Structures are given as C-alpha cells and as structure tokens.
From Swiss-Prot:
One of its GO terms (cellular component) is mitochondrion. Keywords: Coiled coil, Mitochondrion, Ribonucleoprotein, Signal, Sporulation. One of its GO terms (biological process) is sporulation resulting in formation of a cellular spore. Belongs to the SHE10 family. Residues 1-23 form the signal peptide. Residues 525-545 have a biased composition (Basic and acidic residues). This is Outer spore wall assembly protein SHE10. Involved in spore wall assembly. May be a component of the mitochondrial RNase MRP (MtMRP), a ribonucleoprotein endoribonuclease involved in the cleaving RNA transcripts to generate primers for DNA replication in mitochondria. It is found in: Mitochondrion. Residues 525-577 are annotated as: Disordered.
Amino acid sequence: MGKLIKLITTLTVLVSLLQYCCEFNSGSISCERTQTLCHYTNPRVWNTYFSRNCELYKNKVSPGFDIVARKYDTAVKPVIDDATVKVNKVAIQPAFKVIHSQCKKWNCGKYYQLGRSPMVKTRRFFFAKYNAFVKPNLDKFFTAEFRSHLKERILKYKNIGHYYFTITSRCIKSKYDFTVGNTEEKLMGKFKNKDTHGIHGSVTREPSSEDMVLTVSTMESDEEELTTTSTQTVVETITLDQEEASAVANHAHDDEASTDVEGSTDVNVNEQALLQEDFDMWSETILQKTQDVIQLFEKDVSKYINGKLVEEANHFKAKFQSLDDKSKKFFSKISLAINDIECVEGIDSETGKKIFFDKSGSTEISQYITRELVREYFNETRSTLDELTNAMEKDLSEITDEIEKKVNAIREENVEVFEEWGDIIVNEWSKRMAYVDVINAHMGADDDTTLDEEKAKSSVNWKKFLKGKKQIIESRDKLAHHSADLSRVNAFRQKVQKKILSFTQESGEFLYILRSKANLQFQERERKERERKEREKAAAEEFQRQQELLLQQEEEDEEDVSYTSTSTITTTTTMTL
C-alpha cells in the first residue's frame, strides 16, 4: 500500500510539473506529441469529457472540480507565477550567467587526460569480470523469448522517458536561451568564423531511437494518427593535428594547448601499458572462467539429478507398491487353493453330478483342486512377477541412460557457452591489439630506438595473445572431458536393484513355502484317499464274503430240505406196505 501511495504521489507531481510547463510555454510548443501529451494530461480536459458523457460525474463531481479550479486560478496560480518570476530573476538567470562565463574559460583537456586512463582501466576490469561472472548466468536465464519481451518493455519505457526528457530539455533550453542566449553559437562561433583550412570537420547522424507512431483518441473517440517522427543526434567532430591545434590554441592559453597535443601521445602510451597489464589479468580471467563454468556445470547436473531422482523415486515407489499388491493377490489365490485341497465330495440332487465343498462342508468351491491346477497357479505367479521385475530393471537402465544423455547435453551446452565467450574474448583482444598496432604505426615516434621498442612490445603482446588463445582451447578441452558426479545415480540404481533382488528372493522363498505346503496337503489328501479306497476295498471284500456265505448257507438249507422230504416219502411207503 505504501508503494502504491508513493507511485500515485510521484505521478501526481510529474503531471503537475508537466501541466505547469505546458501552461508556461503554451505559445512556444511546436512538437505535436508534446501538445498531445499536454492536452491529455490536463485535468480540465478530462473534466469536460466526463461531464459531457456521465450524468453522475456532472452532478456530483464537476461542481466541486469547478470550485477547486477557480480557487486555484485566483489564489494559487498567481502566487506560483510570481514566485517563478522571482526565482528566475534572482537565482536562475545569475546562475546561468556565472556558469556560462566559467564555461568560456574552463578547458577540460587536462582533466580528461588525467581521468581517462584510470577510467579505461576500471572499465576493462569490470568488463572482464562481467564476462567471467555475470554474462554466463544472464545468457543462461535470459532466453530469447524473455529477451524479446524485455526489449519490448525497455523500448516502451524508453519512449515514455524520451517524451519526458524532451519536454524537460526543451523547457531548460528555452530558459537558458532566454537568459544568456544561444551559448552553443557563442562558444563555437570564434572557431567556425576563422579560416577553416586548418580544421577538418565531419558531421555524422546517428539515430538515437527508432521511428515511432503514436495513435491517440480525441474527445469524440475518433482516432488520429500523428506524423511519424524520428529523433536523431547530430555529432560534430573536429579533428586537429599539432599544427592546426596551434592555430586554434591562439584563443586559449599556450600551455593548455600543448597539454592537449601531448595528451594524444600519452593515450597511446597508456594503451600499450594497459594492454601489457591486462594480459596478466586475462590468464587469471580464463582460469576463473573455467572454474566458474565447471561449477555451473556441476550445479546444473546436481539440480537435474536431484529433480530426476525424486521424480523416479516416486515412480518406482508406485511400481513396487503395484508389484507388492499383485504378488499378494497371486499368493492369496494359491493359499486359497491349498486350503481347498482338503475338500469334501458331494452329489448334486438335481443333476446328479459331483460337487465339491471346502473342508468344513459349508462352502461350495468352483472346481476340484488338482496338482496340475496348483502347478499352473505357481507358474503363472512366477512368470508374472519375473516380467514385472524385468520391466523395472529395464526402466532403471533406461533412466540411467537418459540421465547420462542429459548430463552430456548440459556439458555440451556449457562448453558452447565457454566457446562463445572465448570467441568473443579472442575477437575483442585481436581487435584491440590491431587497433594499438595501427595507432602505433601512424602516430609512432620518429626515434628508431623507440620504434624498435614498440615493435618488440607488439611482438611480445602477440605472443601473449597466442598463449592466451591456446589456454582457452585447453580450458575448453578440459571442460569437454570433465566428468560429472553420478554417485547419487549409482546409489539410486543400486538401491532399486537391491530392492528388486530382495523382493525376488522373498517371493521365491514364499512360493517355496507354499509349494511345500501344497505338497503336504496333496500327500495328506492322497493318503486319505488311499485309506478310503482300502477301506472301501475291504468293505467290498467283506460284503462279497458275506454274500458268498449267504449263498453257501442257502445251498445247505436247500440240501437239508431235500433230505427231509425223501425220508418222509420212504417212511410213508413202508407204512403202506
């Protein structure tokens, strides 16, 4: 909330200053964009617009706005105008006169020469550190898409800043011209009015911003396209040699002119000295850059491996859970079949077919459990679990290969970044050395001894340059063959393999136990069946023996009946006789 209040306050102050400048320079503003900006930031314009289009605003807000505007025109604005005139008369005009008079006398040549050398050295130091530490991270995180969006935003805010800068600069320039006249013509007039055979001028035009088209809405919501304008900077360069500088120096002190001429030679000497000093820093920069790229490579690999292993750990956790659930289903199926080995046989009263019940005789089972059926269950369980564990091992191998490929891709990416950095560094150094050689060739000393020394320095510098280039190539090879830390990947793979092996052993042992239990159950059932068959056989034999005894007894009974009948007949016959 505090930031929002600050933003609103800042915008209010800027708009107020803009409106004051627009009112103060209402007759001297020629830029159509500035006129448009003044028009659409004027509160009176928006008050008129809202009053015309909104009844609520017209009845509630507009009367109060009119009262405030009248009070501002009668009470505030006259005070501000009087204060502005007084400040302009008392402070601004005398200050500009003093500054203008001092600018005529002040020659910045000596200060420029004194300050340029350390500034150049500092700039190159920061440039080297930027390329070594900052640029790789920027190249990594600032993608092409992000850069395009950033460029659009920068261009947008650049245009807005350009508007305010143009308005401010024109206000300042109008005040300055009003106070002391056109100082540029006063300062440069004496140079341009002289004979120009000793001065060679060149004018270049460099665009400072792209052409822009601004479309605004008028009060009647009509669209008006303003003329495309282009802001350009005109740079005027005056090149002086030693003889020509003496002609110009008649308007300044002789010692200052000689200082300027000698300063050009000092610049070249400083360039050679800086070049020799920077070669030592270059080697250190290459080593530091190599270490930084290696650290970035290891950091990227570590970050990728951490994320990948966490993801795959969750996947394998789900796979092991699925494997455990399926194994439990198979084991439960086999255990149920083993329990049903000792079943009870019955006869269906309706169909007359055999049906089977569990050993309690209360629950009917789907089928009779045989050795072949249980053996089929065991084979199905073993083959299914083997397929699942083999698939997990295959997935583990594919994940390992994927990680190795990604690590190689990260290595190649970092190597390409280093190669790009090395190419840029080598090109910049070669351009710099070539520039120094060209300067020395055209502005070298007439003394042969000094010329030989410069040539020797150039030769030494080129040898150092070649050494640095070879160092970059060696560092590139070192990066290309730098091994990544895959210990966590190996540990993860060993952990998964160990868990798979443990599951295989446990499932094998459990299946062995179930197989032994099934064999015991089948042996017990077969023993009982043999005993039952023996009992049935003995019962059958006993029944047959009983039948045979009954038949024999019946035969004996029949013989007894026949003997009794014969005796009776004989006795009867005898008595008759």
